[in-house]
Regions:
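Substrate/cofactor-recognition hotspot
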Residues: 1-201
Length: 201
């Protein structure tokens, strides 16, 4: 099951983790991440996976009505970058959405992800996103956990600071230890070939 995941690069796994952060505002669940990783390895494009994410009830519940485009852009920024858009950024993305371009609300999220990592983007935005990806990967890949409520809690604890990153990793470790306990127990799904440093390039 999910044999293709072990063939993916660290960069590809990071790209998938970013989708969970941006579309669901949580860490990935291991089962879902490994499923989509297998689909990616078998040739499904990241764009197609992103479209599938956008159609999920979890995304719809998070972003609400798309009639409020400024609110939509603001929520994407908060999930991906941990901040509100500045006036120039808001104006740019609204023009893109409303100006007849090929960018749709579904692909706008990917565009903002790409912008955060671009050389022209801010270093603070790139670092914030990279740390959320690290936290999400630790939860789902290193620890192999799939409880969605725990995935939400771990990500919500992150505020951009180094302390909150360490706290989130410690929280994942505590959840893992509880899941491994004979007294409490829990579902763990770790795959051979996807190691402790899943985003090494």
């Amino acid at each position: 099951m999910f044999d293709g995941v072990s063939d993916l690069s660290g960069s590809a796994m990071a790209d998938l983790t970013e989708l969970y952060i941006a579309y669901f505002n949580r860490a990935p669940d291991a089962i879902g991440l490994f499923f989509w990783g297998d689909q990616l390895a078998q040739g499904t494009s990241l764009n197609r996976i992103a479209e599938a994410f956008f159609d999920q009830p979890e995304t719809r519940a998070l972003y609400g009505s798309l009639e409020d485009m400024p609110g939509f852009v603001t929520t994407v920024y908060q999930n991906v970058l941990g901040r509100d858009p500045d006036a120039a950024g808001m104006s740019y993305w609204l023009d893109v959405l409303e100006g007849g371009s090929d960018v749709t609300p579904a692909t706008l999220i990917q565009a903002i992800l790409a912008g955060a990592k671009a050389e022209t983007g801010g270093a603070g935005d790139a670092e914030y996103l990279a740390n959320k990806v690290m936290l999400g990967g630790h939860f789902a890949i290193t620890r192999g956990m799939s409880d969605v409520e725990d995935a939400q809690a771990v990500m919500l604890s992150f505020d951009g600071s180094d302390d909150s990153l360490e706290d989130g990793i410690a929280q994942s470790d505590a959840l893992y230890n509880a899941a491994m306990s004979s007294d409490t127990g829990g579902f763990i799904m770790q795959l051979v070939g996807v190691g402790d440093t899943p985003f090494d390039m």
